[in-house]
Amino acid sequence: MMNNLSHLESDYSEYVEVDPTGRYGRYNEVLGKGSSKTVYRGFDEYQGIEVAWNQVKLYDFLQSPQELERLYCEIHLLKTLKHKSIMKFYASWVDTDNRNINFVTEMFTSGTLRQYRLKHKRVNIRAVKNWCRQILRGLNYLHTHDPPVIHRDLKCDNIFINGNQGEVKIGDLGLAACLQHSHAAHCVGTPEFMAPEVYKEEYNQLVDIYSFGMCVLEMVTFDYPYSECSHPAQIYKRVISGKKPDGLDKVKDPEVRGFIEKCLATVSLRLSACELLDDHFLCIDESDMRRVESEKGLIDEAGTPLRHSYHIPHYSNGYYSLYNQNQWDYNGDETVESHEIDLLEFQNDDDEEEEDKRFGSVDISIKGKRRDNGDGLFLRLKTVNKEGCVRNIYFPFDIETDTAISVAREMVEELEMDDRDVTKIANMIDGEIASLVPNWSIFCSSESNRSSVGSVMDFNEMQCGRDGCEEKHGRFEEITFEITVNDSDEED
């Protein structure tokens, strides 16, 4: 017994770090860990409560006063949100010496709603309704905020729970955006939970309702939506074509399914959080003792999902949303790593006016991710012209054998692009890879003769229609679609 007490005393008697005010102390116990964020157990001496001490490595994200100002604006937003269904945000500060940003939030005893649901599989429908009401109250608060706030990455991994009280709260607001105008204009989030209008980068707060519907689907099936898909491009294709996830067919209860379908309706028919709170499905029925039932999902014998969600956080000129690293849990052990897709965005601003004259009204951006095995990258080049034609080009990049210039030349040749685009594309590829691979040197590798290193999408033939076309050109796989005036009208 004394040995056990001594062990606890050594763990908790000394802080390893204290905040500038002296109020919060950090212990060395890791609650969870992502690629850039580590969560430690902390203590609030004023209130006498345990807290979550979140530490984000900034690396090169803070490169200018503008980016720092933007980061502070986000922190200010999080501090101003006060609601019982929103995670409490206590304090934050920048550690310039160690290039960290630290922020303190409330700590949840049971981790995320997804973890909690996988742990407790036998749940009455009343519990699910209770969770839904709490989440919708939080969304209604965000959406009626002045200005309205869109979460943009709502999923069960970002909803936290204190299981001993049944208290559910929305967290991880790093992708949240204040809606200063009628629409937002960045494609961010997790593909399985993203509404069709998000892919067209013009949307409002109703995208959170769509994501909420997918959360309810996940609650009752244990699966991520679109678990039948193997990568984001397949999900994208199904979403923009209006095809619902196969998991919806597993929902046996017609009342539950009907409620989910209301959330997943087209934006013109989709209800607000306030309207959904008045829905008959969420009415309290003391006599309703049904268990949540669905066909068996993609879960192994240990209760672990067989596929993790993908994630598309938004970066802009090096700015990093501080809550982005979502895949961690309060377990004190090694965190289960998810198959996240970390996408970054690089925009080359040199000689912007001269480039605009040559490229006209074409907007070009590039994003990338590391491959799961760590020995290569996947990149996506996106172009949008003044007519609203969007062209997404996916391709692998081998950091050992490829160079930016060789791949750019190959792309221009395979896709019959303007030869003058080679240098611009190569520069953008180099810039993006430099942000993904810290030791990357521009033009450091010999030119590659490889035509294909892997595949992003499995298309057996070209398929064209109203929602887009897909083609394969060597290593390059292309999706194109048009944003028309009629499309925009439908989503208003």
Swiss-Prot record:
Keywords for the protein's UniProt record, in alphabetical order: ATP-binding, Kinase, Nucleotide-binding, Serine/threonine-protein kinase, Transferase
Originating species: Arabidopsis thaliana (Mouse-ear cress)
For this protein, the record's InterPro entries field holds: Kinase-like_dom_sf, Kinase_OSR1/WNK_CCT, Prot_kinase_dom, Ser/Thr_kinase_AS, WNK_Ser-Thr_kinase
Matches recorded under SUPFAM superfamilies: Protein kinase-like (PK-like)
Please list the residue ranges annotated as the Protein kinase domain.
Answer: 25-282
> What's a single GO BP term from this record?
protein phosphorylation
Q: What does this protein do?
A: May regulate flowering time by modulating the photoperiod pathway.
The taxonomy runs: Eukaryota, Viridiplantae, Streptophyta, Embryophyta, Tracheophyta
Q: Which reaction does this chain catalyze? A: L-seryl-[protein] + ATP = O-phospho-L-seryl-[protein] + ADP + H(+); L-threonyl-[protein] + ATP = O-phospho-L-threonyl-[protein] + ADP + H(+)
Which region is the signal sequence? none
Q: Which family does it belong to?
A: Belongs to the protein kinase superfamily. Ser/Thr protein kinase family. WNK subfamily.
Q: In its UniProt entry, what is this protein called?
A: Probable serine/threonine-protein kinase WNK9
Q: Give one GO term, molecular function aspect.
A: protein kinase activity
Q: Which domain of life is it from?
A: Eukaryota
**Active site, per annotation:** 172
Give its E.C. classification number: 2.7.11.1
Q: Where does ATP bind?
A: 105-108, 155
